Amino acid sequence: MSWIVNKQSSQEELAGRFRKLMSAPDILQIPGAHDGMAALLAKEAGFSAIYLSGAAYTASRGLPDLGIITSAEIAERAKDLVRAADLPLLVDIDTGFGGVLNAARTAREMLEARVAAVQMEDQQLPKKCGHLNGKQLVPIKEMAQKIKAIKQAAPSLIVVARTDARAQEGLDAAIKRSEAYIEAGADAIFPEALQAENEFRQFAERIPVPLLANMTEFGKTPYYRADEFEDMGFHMVIYPVTSLRAAAKACERMFGLMKEHGSQKEGLHDMQTRKELYDTISYYDYEALDKTIAKTVLPDE
């Protein structure tokens, strides 16, 4: 049913669902959804939560992931995803978009968008993708202050603290930072760019809160299955840019086909049909809002 007329979950309800999911015995798979259509397809596939990646969002706007977007911009996209799917959403808020006050403002914006959880990292600006070299980190105290500010500004918002320290300072330092972030109020920890099974297991042995793994493509982490992350002691796994990469490659192939053949006909088998599209976006639910609108009759495919 259309979100315009259907009762949707409150932020508190969505956060409560996310908290239960991340604490459940089975690992929580969280696919990235870079737009509303991807969010709907993730829900259709049976996922219980979705993720908004800063990298995927910026790329969807033709921009690099270098900290050049604003909190208001990503909050607007987050609102689209929650409206579309009514699923708990974990949002990548980079470094909090500035200092402590910026992090607090971001938290309030996420609350207004009905976001269930946020992920914040301990990099300095300009930040980089977590699987690239040359990252610089803020002091532990600064990251802890941001976490405290978020929890004060938006108590119901779940905070997943990401540390990029493994690459710059080593595994023990990453664990030490994580312990400080938990003390500051973080609800879960995201150790970025771990590179081997023993590293994941060490984190799980020493960190008492739910842990999130990043199964991005073309990164430093080997391609583990969800059940393998679960066996290593992790509670969540994200696939941050998968939807955008798949969509972009499909567009690239289709545009090449159109340019080569002067038509898209040869690629129709790779497209959503009109019926599939209408079913996904609940077209007829919207049309039913006005009984005077004639029901659309689909042409033969």
UniProtKB/Swiss-Prot annotation:
Magnesium in keyword set: yes
Binding site for Mg(2+): D92, D94
Binding site residues for substrate: S53, G54, A55, C129, G130, R162, E192, N214, M215, T216, R245, R274
Needed cofactors: Mg(2+)
EC assignment: 4.1.3.-
Reactions the enzyme catalyzes: 3-hydroxybutane-1,2,3-tricarboxylate = pyruvate + succinate
GO annotation terms (biological process): propionate catabolic process, 2-methylcitrate cycle
CDD domains: ICL_PEPM
A GO term for molecular function: methylisocitrate lyase activity
InterPro entries per UniProt: ICL/PEPM, Isocitrate_lyase_ph_CS, PrpB, Pyrv/PenolPyrv_kinase-like_dom, Pyrv_kinase-like_dom_sf
Function of the protein: Involved in the methylcitric acid cycle. Catalyzes the cleavage of 2-methylisocitrate to yield pyruvate and succinate.
Protein name as it appears in the record: 2-methylisocitrate lyase
Organism: Bacillus subtilis (strain 168)
Taxon lineage: Bacteria, Bacillati, Bacillota, Bacilli, Bacillales
Gene that this sequence comes from: mmgF
